[in-house]
Swiss-Prot record:
Residues involved in Cu(+) 1 binding: 16, 19
List of catalytic residues: 495
Coiled coil: none
Taxonomic classification: Bacteria, Bacillati, Bacillota, Bacilli, Bacillales
Organism encoding this protein: Staphylococcus aureus (strain USA300 / TCH1516)
Binding site for Cu(+) 2: 83, 86
GO biological process: copper ion homeostasis
Family: Belongs to the cation transport ATPase (P-type) (TC 3.A.3) family. Type IB subfamily.
Topology with respect to the bilayer: Multi-pass membrane protein
The name this protein goes by in its record: Copper-exporting P-type ATPase
Catalytic activity: Cu(+)(in) + ATP + H2O = Cu(+)(out) + ADP + phosphate + H(+)
Amino acid sequence: MANTKKTTLDITGMTCAACSNRIEKKLNKLDDVNAQVNLTTEKATVEYNPDQHDVQEFINTIQHLGYGVAVETVELDITGMTCAACSSRIEKVLNKMDGVQNATVNLTTEQAKVDYYPEETDADKLVTRIQKLGYDASIKDNNKDQTSRKAEALQHKLIKLIISAVLSLPLLMLMFVHLFNMHIPALFTNPWFQFILATPVQFIIGWQFYVGAYKNLRNGGANMDVLVAVGTSAAYFYSIYEMVRWLNGSTTQPHLYFETSAVLITLILFGKYLEARAKSQTTNALGELLSLQAKEARILKDGNEVMIPLNEVHVGDTLIVKPGEKIPVDGKIIKGMTAIDESMLTGESIPVEKNVDDTVIGSTMNKNGTITMTATKVGGDTALANIIKVVEEAQSSKAPIQRLADIISGYFVPIVVGIALLTFIVWITLVTPGTFEPALVASISVLVIACPCALGLATPTSIMVGTGRAAENGILFKGGEFVERTHQIDTIVLDKTGTITNGRPVVTDYHGDNQTLQLLATAEKDSEHPLAEAIVNYAKEKQLILTETTTFKAVPGHGIEATIDHHYILVGNRKLMADNDISLPKHISDDLTHYERDGKTAMLIAVNYSLTGIIAVADTVKDHAKDAIKQLHDMGIEVAMLTGDNKNTAQAIAKQVGIDTVIADILPEEKAAQIAKLQQQGKKVAMVGDGVNDAPALVKADIGIAIGTGTEVAIEAADITILGGDLMLIPKAIYASKATIRNIRQNLFWAFGYNIAGIPIAALGLLAPWVAGAAMALSSVSVVTNALRLKKMRLEPRRKDA
């Protein structure tokens, strides 16, 4: 191979020599490729002709065989971006780099997220490439105070704006002369006076536009800086030309446009300041989450209590938390009891009772008892840290609706420059032949009214504010695409156990005396069955003392037999009673039938062959489940229940909460197939679940929603996590999605509409340059301000017919 290139890839999933041989053989079948795969190092070294192949082709080949290629992710802070053309260009360049799998650049957060193959490239190369484009970039430091950095940058913008405004204000007086024929002192019309004020604005305050324009043009791109630099320079240097003519005596009344260039720069700086200030408010939700973290912890060392910084707490440390203090990290109580305010996590204002062996979550508030706990998760592994990570990823992700704006942003500035040149030519040749000034003014107006910034900000600002507001309410979207997909949902499928119900059986009905209950609970206390646990807890709530069982025997399919203090106990179904010649009074038989029809597990109790009681146990429906399902129905969404339970139990639960469609007797592995059936009917399906067996269905659904009290597997598989398990958050999540997408559409309509209408109006000469500049400055501000309305969004779903 004359022209060769070598690359190394880390391969995952190989288990034996057959795997490495298979990959090597497949790669070597490609033309002009020489590949060697090492099982020990788990690396593939590939020599190839870059004119025929690229690295992505090898990666696709390996992945098609069922193996993986190791990918690393880095987040970068980028400064110097002024509009969507900047972020679009950086993203395009990064995605063309060797070894980059995917890169997204967010103008609002001023960050890039890059997935790359570590054997092909590294974070330093990514940073260097961005810097070559003319922007400052660095690897994101999670320990760095981003808020203070942004505050300093905002303060710097304000200082520049004030200086620019002070210098431009006297020049602004000249506009009032043109508009209202006002009389002003002669000093203001003096060319030297105007030159002295306008020059520092143009070349000191406005130098950032020249630098940005130069860097972009040097790298074959164009952004807002190009438009501002060209537009203001045209006005400034034409004024210099007129001033030279005045000095030479060629004219006694030069037509100067110093005020146009200076006021334009001031207005644009004003718009950028307002935009930056508004953008800083979009990240408030993340700041509020970060502020919830405890700053220090009280650790028990050698019997002494010592206060240490939070980052010095390790897994296994013994911590003491007193009333009114925050739980420092995730852990388990080993001593004491208390009530914990978990509202920051679940939104539930009522404190939760906690005892020994109960789990506590970091950053929740200890209300009224001193507890000793063991740290189980610290640092980035805590529940709050994971929530913050999910919110950050969602806020920096892109929704599919943004693609059109990104495509247009890439071509926007060159097109606008072309329109401005065409405007100049048409004016000077056709509209006002031979007259330079009207052509110049119209073309400057075209340059400065065009605003790619509004296009670039339309989607990410709404996503940031919308996902932040949702997170404040306990709803975690894992990305912008899931925000967009959720608003299309027309069918929601709910798992029963742990989702609609609490997932733990409790005694719902008992008829009998305390002695019978005491004997029953004693008989059941050594059993690990959930129903037995419910009975024992019920007896303890009644403060009954449980004794010891003399004999115990399970009767498969029927119940149990036990001897306690010379009492012979039978607990079970009708068949067990019949086998022991115990007759059932009609009212007991009717009660039994009634409980079974309601989906409860009913048990008969006999002491010494005499029927003494009946008890019913059931997994109870969650608070607000019925209200949540009613809200979904009001929104025009079909609701179905999917469960492995028998049809009678499922129908009973469905009736309680108002669900019409019940899919029962389903094996765990069949759940995903049931979701697929609904999708084949053209439905957009969301699956809500909490267990390991729900994970395949969560992945198969258009949107997977995990209940936060569920397993990590379910949460990992889901697109949305509902913290705390309150079903009322499901309609709220859908409404948050609808409100966010509606806001994005409003922003895009304004951004496109503004440019579509503004550019022709400017080209027709109907706008003075300073008016065009003011409109451009305020267009992006209006987009961000509209997005900020989502901060006040009340997550109350609307009726479909409302």
